[in-house]
Amino acid sequence: EAWGRVVVENQLVEQGGRWTIDFADFERKAKEVKVFLLCSPHNPLGIVWTKEQLKKMADICIANNVLLVSDEIHSDLIFHGKKHIPTATVSKEIAGKVISCISGTKTFNLAGLQASTTVFPDLETKERFDRFWTNMDIHRNNAFSSVAMEAAFNEGEEWLEQLLIYLDGHFEYVRSFCEKRIPQIKV
């Protein structure tokens, strides 16, 4: 909105005790927009989208000529045996239509470094976004953040394993607390 854009929201709906995309609403609204920002996995709910859900969202975007930007910054923070599926891997057609945003800032506690990577489907899309970022004065990675990200991704596996155990303990504590003391809240 600060950049003169209009935000069109697709509210999640509860089905069978789980939150999901309201695909009928999504399809209606896809006719009105130019860009769809997907958070995969979802933040803050932690929904890990299935291949079928990702494909359906992507197919709707393709049918309506909507650019799909997939924010996959939380993709390493997955629990309970679920697996992150990168949106661009759902099909060959989708791979050529998705901009993927990735980063180790959440996973490796490097958020203050403002480091991320964007994967574009082609050079034309990248050049278009380079012009946009320049006009919006959006900051780029710096030498320190690039080295930190490289070190985190190359040497941070043990950190990630321990982090997931630690976070799972917190999840279990909250689940148990709510189950015993606030049963109206489903975790």
Could you say what each language-model-derived stretch is?
Residues E1-V7:
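Substrate-binding/gating loop at the entrance of the active-site cleft, primarily
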Residues R5, A63-L67, A95-G96:
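A short helix->loop->beta-strand "cap" motif at the edges of active sites that frequently abuts
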Residues V8, V69, I99-C101:
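Structural detector of well-ordered beta-strand residues that form the stable sheet scaffold
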Residues L12-K82:
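Active-site phosphate-binding strand-loop segment of PLP-dependent enzymes
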Residues G81-I85, A95:
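Substrate-gripping "pore-loop 1 plus following alpha2 helix"
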Residues K97-K180, Q184-V187:
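PLP-dependent aminotransferase class I/II
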